[in-house]
């Protein structure tokens, strides 16, 4: 998958298949403890993802100062298209490879040959289409004169979708370190390309580079940097391709597609739900002439919310093997319920940590983007609900009713569409933010209700509600104190004394939240240990 600086949520990896005899984790494979091996590999796979998110966040100050709001909006729109098209072009064959490569009597080489040939053919045919009609596509999107950017997107998709199968093969063979190394090199290449383009090229404009990017910083820099990283990634896979044994099996391919295409269809609502609002800005935003600016401002606010997403991603890496490992334990359900409470409390700490110091966080982004700072707490709460949704959704994974996930996601997608279509023409990016919040809330409620029916877990909704009440009280006290005691005091524009006192009070409120969490969760840690025995 792409690791661009514009955040794109990753497709979640499935449970890895039974490992082969070789082990590239640096030691002899421990067949007696596959879950320990899985957890170790998950941690390695997660390093590149977490690194991408961190670099992603670190580049926000540069992007929001070196790009206009409109240019940043264009990048956001393009990345939304890429995210959706990736799911379509891979056809779900990543997962299909895992399933068929482990079937008795099936040659894994034939499985990956079929998948690689199919995805390569489709994605590079799509690239050819983008090249042939780049002018028409650019004009239709309102980017006449930027045909090269359309071609870059086609190249990104072709290379990224093809290497997705090769990455799947590395996972199948448990070559976790090689997987992480290639991903990391790709991320660092993109970082270096961005540094060169934004900080060196504008003062060293030349005819050669002028064929690929604009002479002054704009969205072409970001897209071209991603393309360069995809090319480097493809080059690193050349040794694998040289050793690759191509065995095409038409019958096997048909079986793989019958299995994989429904998975692709099932994944589409989820990815569309995450990125639909970015696409709708073009058609529904309040100011039709400045919709790109609105989208850029919204995306900057989303970027400041990435700290919540980073924690959730790290939690997911650890939580899935944790949940599955204990699924058969007597006290498993009680343990899951307690985990949910601690997860909620920590997410609340992150939310308040940003909300109470929102003035400080606003200094990260450029002045032109700060009109969207009010959206940040809404997006933080949205992502918090998304993380809680992951927790309550374990029921259909543990009970085998994974088909329910499609309907839950479709319900969330419907809410996203309704909220944005009705409110975006009037409220612009505020509608997009509340669309996320409403969508994740509905999905959370539906999943929790169905989970109580099919796989009941004794969640303490009183404690969880108490935590949310505590978060709400702290937020209200913060806003009340700012209005009554520190009116007009903003970090960076007021006296040092008033700024210091304001930060001191907010720190006290954050400590009060921590103390409140200790009261709400009193005794639950011991109960978790008891449930583990």
What are these regions (language model features)?
Residues 147, 151, 180-241, 266, ...:
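Hydrophobic alpha-helical transmembrane segments
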């Amino acid at each position: 998958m792409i690791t661009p600086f514009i955040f794109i949520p990753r497709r979640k990896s499935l449970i890895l298949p039974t490992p082969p005899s070789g082990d590239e984790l640096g030691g002899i494979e421990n067949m007696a403890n596959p879950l320990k091996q899985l957890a170790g590999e998950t941690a390695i796979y997660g390093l590149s993802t977490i690194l991408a998110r961190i670099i992603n966040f670190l580049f926000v100050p540069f992007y929001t100062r070196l790009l206009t709001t409109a240019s940043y909006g264009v990048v956001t729109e393009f990345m939304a298209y890429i995210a959706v098209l990736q799911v379509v072009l891979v056809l779900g064959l990543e997962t299909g490879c895992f399933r068929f490569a482990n079937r008795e009597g099936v040659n894994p080489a034939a499985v990956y040959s079929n998948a690689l040939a199919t995805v390569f053919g489709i994605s590079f045919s799509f690239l050819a289409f983008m090249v042939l009609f780049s002018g028409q596509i650019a004009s239709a999107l309102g980017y006449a004169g930027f045909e090269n950017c359309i071609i870059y997107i086609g190249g990104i998709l072709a290379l990224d979708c093809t290497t997705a199968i090769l990455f799947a093969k590395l996972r199948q063979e448990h070559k976790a370190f090689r997987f992480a190394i290639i991903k990391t090199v790709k991320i660092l290449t993109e970082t270096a390309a961005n540094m060169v383009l934004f900080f060196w090229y504008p003062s060293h404009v030349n005819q050669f580079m002028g064929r690929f990017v604009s002479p002054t910083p704009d969205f072409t820099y970001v897209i071209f940097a991603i393309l360069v990283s995809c090319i480097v990634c493809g080059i690193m896979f050349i040794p694998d391709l040289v050793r690759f044994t191509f065995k095409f099996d038409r019958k096997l391919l048909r079986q793989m597609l019958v299995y994989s295409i429904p998975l692709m269809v099932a994944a589409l609502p989820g990815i569309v739900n995450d990125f639909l609002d970015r696409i709708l800005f073009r058609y529904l935003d309040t100011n039709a002439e400045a919709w790109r600016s609105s989208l850029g401002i919204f995306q900057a606010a989303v970027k400041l919310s990435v700290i919540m997403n980073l924690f959730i991603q790290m939690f997911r890496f650890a939580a899935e093997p944790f949940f599955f490992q204990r699924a058969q334990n007597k006290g498993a359900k009680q343990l899951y319920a307690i985990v949910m409470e601690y997860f909620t409390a920590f997410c609340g700490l992150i939310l308040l940590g940003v909300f109470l110091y929102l003035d400080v966080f606003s200094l990260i982004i450029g002045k032109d983007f700060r009109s969207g700072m009010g959206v940040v707490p809404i997006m933080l709460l949205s992502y918090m609900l998304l993380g809680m949704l992951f927790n309550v959704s374990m029921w259909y994974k543990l009970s085998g009713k994974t088909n329910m996930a499609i309907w839950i996601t479709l319900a969330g997608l419907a809410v996203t569409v309704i909220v944005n279509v009705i409110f975006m023409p009037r409220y612009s990016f505020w509608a997009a933010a509340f669309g996320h919040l409403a969508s994740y809330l509905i999905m959370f409620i539906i999943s929790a209700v169905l989970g109580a029916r099919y796989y009941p877990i004794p969640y303490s909704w009183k404690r969880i509600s108490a935590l949310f009440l505590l978060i709400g009280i702290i937020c209200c006290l913060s806003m009340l104190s700012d209005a009554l005691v520190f009116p007009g005091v903003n970090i960076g524009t007021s006296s040092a004394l008033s700024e210091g006192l304001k930060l001191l009070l907010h720190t006290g409120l954050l400590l009060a939240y921590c103390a409140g969490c200790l009261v709400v969760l009193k005794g639950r840690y011991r109960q978790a240990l008891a449930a583990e025995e």
